[in-house]
Swiss-Prot record:
PROSITE patterns: RIBOSOMAL_L23. This is Large ribosomal subunit protein uL23. Belongs to the universal ribosomal protein uL23 family. GO terms for cellular component: ribonucleoprotein complex; ribosome. Part of the 50S ribosomal subunit. Contacts protein L29, and trigger factor when it is bound to the ribosome. It comes from Mycolicibacterium gilvum (strain PYR-GCK) (Mycobacterium gilvum (strain PYR-GCK)).
């Protein structure tokens, strides 16, 4: 991902779960990101897309689950998640229509 022009190629989608929705109150947001992206690229992409100040970025590589099919076993796609903490004075991101 050395020569990515569009930051929307790095940030693929927000993670919609009970845990990620609860972390919004603490200015912590979770996104599914491109597997080859690094923390610096993720930080720059979030700041450009949402026009906020990012404090820190943590990443986690999640392996795909092994699932049974009719003919044997298959594998779900592996994902990379980024847990982004916004700076203290930054405005909240309105992803899910959460109360600010």
């Amino acid at each position: 991902m050395a020569n990515v022009v569009d930051p929307r190629d790095i940030i693929l989608s927000p993670v919609i779960s009970e845990k990620s929705y609860g972390l919004i109150e603490d200015n912590v947001y979770t996104f599914i990101v491109h597997p080859d992206s690094n923390k610096t690229q993720i930080k720059i992409a979030i700041e450009k897309i949402f026009k906020v100040k990012v404090d820190s970025v943590n990443t986690a590589n999640r392996p795909g689950k092994r699932k049974r099919t009719r003919t044997g076993y298959g594998q779900r796609k592996a994902t990379k998640r980024a847990i982004v903490t916004l700076a203290a004075g930054s405005k909240p991101i309105d992803l899910f229509g959460a109360p600010a």
